Amino acid sequence: MPAGSNEPDGVLSYQRPDEEAVVDQGGTSTILNIHYEKEELEGHRTLYVGVRMPLGRQSHRHHRTHGQKHRRRGGRGKGASQGEEGLEALAHDTPSQRVQFILGTEEDEEHVPHELFTELDEICMKEGEDAEWKETARWLKFEEDVEDGGERWSKPYVATLSLHSLFELRSCLINGSVLLDMRASSIEEISDLILDQQELLRDLSDSVRVKVREALLKKHHHQNERRRNNLIPIVRSFAEVGKKQSDPHSMDRDGQTVSPQSATNLEVKNGVNCEHSPVDLSKVDLHFMKKIPTGAEASNVLVGEVDTLDRPIVAFVRLSPAVLLSGLTEVPIPTRFLFILLGPVGKGQQYHEIGRSMATIMTDEIFHDVAYKAKERDDLLAGIDEFLDQVTVLPPGEWDPSIRIEPPKNVPSQEKRKMPGVPNGNVCHIEPEPHGGHSGPELERTGRLFGGLVLDVKRKAPWYWSDYRDALSLQCLASFLFLYCACMSPVITFGGLLGEATEGRISAIESLFGASMTGIAYSLFAGQPLTILGSTGPVLVFEKILFKFCKDYALSYLSLRALIGLWTAFLCIVLVATDASSLVCYITRFTEEAFASLICIIFIYEAIEKLIHLAETYPIHMHSQLDHLSLYYCRCVLPENPNNHTLQYWKDHNILAAEVNWANLTVSECQEMHGEFMGSACGHHGPYTPDVLFWSCILFFATFIVSSTLKTFKTSRYFPTRVRSMVSDFAVFLTIFTMVVLDFLIGVPSPKLQVPNVFKPTRDDRGWFINPIGPNPWWTVIAAIIPALLCTILIFMDQQITAVIINRKEHKLKKGCGYHLDLLMVAVMLGVCSIMGLPWFVAATVLSITHVNSLKLESECSAPGEQPKFLGIREQRVTGLMIFVLMGCSVFMTAVLKFIPMPVLYGVFLYMGVSSLQGIQFFDRLKLFGMPAKHQPDFIYLRHVPLRKVHLFTLVQLTCLVLLWVIKASPAAIVFPMMVLALVFVRKVMDLCFSKRELSWLDDLMPESKKKKLDDAKKKEEEEAEKMLDIGGDKFPLESRKLLSSPGKSSSFRCDPSEINISDEMPKTTVWKALSINSGNTKEKSPFN
């Protein structure tokens, strides 16, 4: 550090009534004002020379005016010798250690770090010219510059600084004034305090002082204050629609009306508003104000040229408390920091780069905290040195500094810079946390009957009412409308298939009623209401097998089914009572992704399959001869060989086939009377209908493409943020509405959604309640246990795997989960549905994932250039509740629902399947097979696991997925849940092929036995004890519960030669020596030559 200052050894105390600023002489003092003593380290409080401290009794405080100068007198006794001893120890501290010590100090109310908005203003005062401060750049997270034309802001970009300007900034802080915790309420007072301090450091003539003060009090012109009178309103782009322009009658942030500014309020003195003038909202960019976090403070960087100066005036000021200085900052927030650099004319670009450096490091997370907690100049220098210790240097011959670097999508965490024992920014090898992906109190076995269920209820009860309050959002309305349409079609389709399999004993109306009743109960009382219940393929296979068995052995299907359902419900309740859901911790990412991928692929496959099957009803008339179009016909004729069903129909309705004029019948009349269609223009089920299949394909793919496009509209560059967010939230609903209107206008008879319009059982020979025994023999009560066991496994696996996927840590759920409570609700409603002869419903994976994705929360207040942060999921019960309430009311809405084309719903299925695949690591790894190594994405697991092991893991997972698909598509689909359970054992076997470290990166670690846990814990404690013995130096705990080597003489020996102290090495550089020489020259020389 450059020495050689001839300034007096003392501390100036600027005082007003009840106000005092801590002034640090820095380079002007011959003593470094810092002591690291044992007692102070233990208490995390440091005694600084220059600050009045009570010693034994309260000292009397003298009050002085700004212009008075006071120098402390006194000898250097014992305290001074202790300071020298501390200095010797300090010389061996790295900047990182000093910063850790500063950040470890206790916080008080006046030094709590806030978010900062930094503004760079520049001025050039020359004789005879009227100058004003002009805003040239601003920082909220990234740098934005006023473009050369002065009409617009640049895109946010990552600031690139020259190392030379950083060295110059450090020199400024060493040789300039540092005033910490200044108490002032106006820019005039701040200017007087700064100039008073400058008079102690150098001789300022009255004319220079007046000129500098005049410069500091000049008016500030901000970019948003451009003339609006010349702007024609129609010229405003659509991107500004929705942005609030400045309005004197606007509401302020607290909701209070700000009245128009009166003439007296607009009086200015020396270009600055009076002390008590209110904020003039006509000069505030309210749209940009929304991006500033609540409670943020301002950091003003003022640099410029003044022709009367022969050497620079530098000052760093921290106000306490922060003060709202009207007209100084672009937005009306209180100012906490000021950095002032005024120098001779001719070096404006140099001052600009120093100002950019100051503003940029103020946005640095670590230096930002240091600036708030600094007690003196050396703390700020330690912060800059630590910043320099972490910077990355770009070779001058390989990079153009004028290129603006786009802000990264994800900003790396700076927590590693707060970790002790990591010298020079070298990050130690970080191992992933060795616990499983679902560890938590929800899955701990209590050992008590229904213990897990009781804990689930206690965990969810405090959040119950908030589950309804949190639903007051347009996002929930969009989610509800989208998922209602998405849930209706599979429920009705499942009911139709079930009706075909059971000869109408359970059909569409029962499916609709069962889904509505089960969904409402689950949404009201389940532990995780984000899960959506639906029908599953294995359940349909089970129903088919059971119906065939009952038909072969002359048993009542509905009665036996009711018994099996009751036994299944009872067994599920037993699983709840025994905390069996704790076994979920064995379901790792390997099993989750295989199961979720299969369900997503099934959604995609079935959507395309249903579209293809439309060709059977609406065939394509291929190889048409255009010259013979006039000869095409399709007529209704008498069946040549009527079957018994047709003859019985004619007999029941007294129809004489020979007397019917078949050729004159309409299509519907011909079908009703069991006639046949004959002719070259006939299809499978009647006359050929042109264009239907192709129009259905258009609707199908258009729905998928438009939904996907509108969903990503949130990240586009068009329209304001609020409009983009709303379009993105309502993407699927808007798509369905658009396609329905388009289909109605085109008029092509596409297949429509068929909803039952009467609320009664499908068959007249059954009611809404089923006798569990009925006509069946008594032994069926006991025999029903066997298929109930299989059903229990089916229900448990489907429900819990979906619950695990929804409750993953990546979703940042805050209200906890309830595996036991979820399973209880499914079991109870399964029993109710069995008694009422309704289908069984369990958690639907794709619908649940889609529900969660539609409720994602992102930060609204994001800095320009910063990607919105994912905050979590809007956890509430209302969307699921309304989906199933409206589903139950669908019977009375057939007049509207009949207009929805089925291809549109198939397109929604395709969209849900594809969108649910996003974020599944298995598909990311699958794509690696077709990529050369140099083009592969920078996935974190590729850094730590060999590529061949990654491919092996993916192949095993792919093989399991193919096996699951084969079983699912075969008649043996009823054992599908057993195969999903087998995946857990396959994953356990993989422990033999992969190391624990590799699996921790590719998958979640499976729980180990209690004995092995104890052995591992004991071994870890022994290793840590040996490590502590090998490391020298005293250790003491910080508030962050980390260990930091106390600064002392013992740290002077460094066993690692690569560990350097940048504060020691910097003075050895030629650049720093040149700066030091210049700063030590006479007053005529500038330190920036």
From Swiss-Prot:
Expressed in the hippocampal neurons (at protein level). Highly expressed in brain with lower levels in lung, kidney and heart. In the kidney, there is high expression in the inner medulla, localized to the inner medullary collecting duct. In the brain, there seems to be three transcripts each having a different expression pattern. The smaller 3kb transcript has highest expression levels in the thalamus and the largest 9.5kb transcript has highest levels in the substantia nigra. The middle transcript of 4.4kb, which is also the main transcript in kidney, is highly expressed in thalamus. Glycans are attached at N644. The chain crosses the membrane at residues 477-497, 506-526, 564-584, 594-614, 686-706, 730-750, 777-797, 823-843, 880-900, 903-923, 961-981. Disulfide bonds join C634-C682, C636-C670. GO terms for biological process: basolateral protein secretion; modulation of chemical synaptic transmission; positive regulation of synaptic vesicle exocytosis; regulation of intracellular pH; regulation of membrane potential; regulation of synaptic vesicle exocytosis. Residues 498-505, 585-593, 707-729, 798-822, 901-902, 982-1089 are cytoplasmic. InterPro entries: Band3_cytoplasmic_dom (IPR013769), HCO3_transpt-like_TM_dom (IPR011531), HCO3_transpt_euk (IPR003020), Na/HCO3_transpt (IPR003024), PTrfase/Anion_transptr (IPR016152). Coiled coil: none annotated. GO terms for molecular function: active monoatomic ion transmembrane transporter activity; identical protein binding; sodium,bicarbonate:chloride antiporter activity; sodium:bicarbonate symporter activity. Residues 58-76 have a biased composition (Basic residues). Mediates electroneutral sodium- and carbonate-dependent chloride-HCO3(-) exchange with a Na(+):HCO3(-) stoichiometry of 2:1. Plays a major role in pH regulation in neurons. Mediates sodium reabsorption in the renal cortical collecting ducts. Homodimer. Belongs to the anion exchanger (TC 2.A.31) family. This is Electroneutral sodium bicarbonate exchanger 1. It comes from Mus musculus.
